[in-house]
Amino acid sequence: MTDVPATFTQAECNGDKPPENGQQPITKISEELTDVDSPLPHYRVEPSLEGAPTKGSQEERRKLQGNMLLNSSMEEKILKENPEEKLFVVHKAITDLSLQETSADEMTFREGRQWEKIPLSGSNQEIRRQKERITEQPLKEEEDEDRKNKGHQAAEIEWLGFRKPSQADMLHSKHDEEQKVWDEEIDDDDDDNCNDDEDEVRVIEFKKKHEEVSQFKEEGDASEDSPLSSASSQAVTPDEQPTLGKKSDISRNAYSRYNTISYRKIRKGNTKQRIDEFESMMHL
């Protein structure tokens, strides 16, 4: 059997040209990889010339071991060179969890788990219930007031036996009341005017009587002051006496006529007409 070197060339690892020395033992590569902090375990390959299998089986084993070492070294290099990616992944997972905990809606997780709604605390539920009650109370009060008003109206209609008066009826009733008040005021004014007329007529009658008495006194004084020696004055003919009686009769007739006819005119007329008629009667 021929001796087979138990080393990997540098060209097999990364495809570069081999170094001038020609070969590098696999033990050095394994020692460098163990120095790196990695969670993945790997095994050292220490070739032994004693009891080696055939050439084909040895080559297959070497290829498998080389692939494993390459994969582990690549992962370690990525973690060392880009630690930010690892932090980003962790931060993203934390934010996803926080959002899922705070949200009240149902959310689906990446693995397919379904999150239920987070129940609110007792204080928040009580606050919401109080707000709903406050909003519902005024609506219920308005509905109750409307129902009460309708019930009162229906009861009044049943009790009275007729419907309530409309606005037109109210206006007519107000107009009738105003008309009655106006008529009463006019009647009161008429009564006052009649009383005033009666008072004025009484004053006129009193003046008329006073004038007649004064006239009779003046006539008596004139007859006493006349000379008694004159025969014509002493001898009074019987024809002259009726003349005096006629004058008195005329004055009485005029007064009676004034008291009957003109009294009505004065009572019906206004103040100016009353004054004019009184002056005309005085001139008679």
UniProtKB/Swiss-Prot annotation:
Start-end of Low complexity biased regions: 225-235
Organism: Pongo abelii
Keyword Acyltransferase listed: no
Alphabetical list of PANTHER family matching this protein: ERMIN
Keywords: Actin-binding, Cytoplasm, Cytoskeleton, Phosphoprotein
Start-end of Basic and acidic residues biased regions: 126-140, 171-183, 201-220
Name of the protein: Ermin
Function in brief: Plays a role in cytoskeletal rearrangements during the late wrapping and/or compaction phases of myelinogenesis as well as in maintenance and stability of myelin sheath in the adult. May play an important role in late-stage oligodendroglia maturation, myelin/Ranvier node formation during CNS development, and in the maintenance and plasticity of related structures in the mature CNS.
This protein's GO CC annotations: cell cortex; cytoskeleton; extracellular exosome; filopodium; internode region of axon; myelin sheath; neuronal cell body; paranode region of axon
Modified residues (Phosphoserine): S73, S214, S226, S230, S233
Main location: cytoplasm
Region annotation (Binds actin) ranges: 265-284
